[in-house]
Each structure stands twice: as structure tokens, then as C-alpha cells.
Amino acid sequence: MRKLKYPIGISDFAEMRNNGYYYIDKTNVIVDLLDKGPVEVTQITRPRRFGKSLGMSTLANFLDIRKDSKQMFEGLAISKNTTLCKKWMNQCPVVFFSFKDTDGLTFESAYGMLRMKLAFAFQDYQFLLDDDAISDDDKGIFKRILGLSLIHI
């Protein structure tokens, strides 16, 4: 029998599933979120160390169009819902970042970290700049976000 490791301090779903860590299957939360239909905002509030970042990482890995997550979700509750998996798994562009390591001692430092995280997230989608379906105006906005010049209050 393979000995599983405790995921102390790990909140990345892919790291847990790919590296032999204990994982308590909460993928039915994804089913609950996606079966509700379109909603403008879903707010998830829980105390610290309650699994919010892991839950968001799980959702990001499930939806991200840049990934092939079938094997990662194999054997989990959500994999039994084949209709939902066909409709949603790896079908969406995902921009994901966590604030768990963000120093919020001052507004300026938290804001600076947010700007950098947003620009870094946009780097993964630079291929969109070559897409003819994207307008020149949107490409210009995209480039300014990449250069941090558009992100201001």
C-alpha cells in the first residue's frame, strides 16, 4: 500500500493529486457551483485555513482550457458526472491567483502586489494578441495591462 503524505501548507490541487498527498474529495462543490446556472457573483467566506485556496485551485484546474485534467480528476466524485465533465472540463479560459501570500500591511503594498499578479496572469494569454477575433482596442488594453500602465485607481 502506498503511503500518502500530509499536505501541510499545500493549497495547490494539481500538486496534491500528482505528488501523492492525502486529498479529501470536495469536487461536488464544483457540481453545486456549475449546476446553479449563470450567476453574477459567488462569494465564498470561511475562516483562515479552511480550504478556500484549495477549492479555487481545484475549480481552476477543472475549468482551465490550457490543461488536460481528466486524469487528475479520475476517481473523484465529479468524474461520475460525465455530462458536466463534457460540458465544462477544460473548456474555459481561467485567470487564477491567490491572495494568501499577499502582504497587506499597507494599501500601497497590497495594491502593488495585485497589479503585479494581474499583469503576470495576463502573460499566460499573450497568444490572444495574435487572434484576429480580438479587436485592436482590446489588444491595446491587454498590452497596457501587461505593462502595468492601465492598472490604476
Regions found by a protein language model. Give the residues of each.
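N-terminal pre-Walker A segment at the start of P-loop NTPase domains
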Residues: I8-V31
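Walker A/P-loop nucleotide-binding motif
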Residues: V41-G55
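C-terminal leucine-rich, beta-strand-based interaction scaffolds used for sensing/assembly
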Residues: R2-K5
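A conserved segment at the C-terminal end of the G1
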Residues: S57-L63
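Short, glycine/acidic-rich hinge or "gate" loops at secondary-structure transitions
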Residues: F73, F127-K139
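Phosphate-binding P-loop
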Residues: D32-V39
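Conserved small/polar residues in nucleotide/adenosyl-binding loops
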Residues: I151-I153
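P-loop NTPase motor core
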Residues: D64, D68-F127
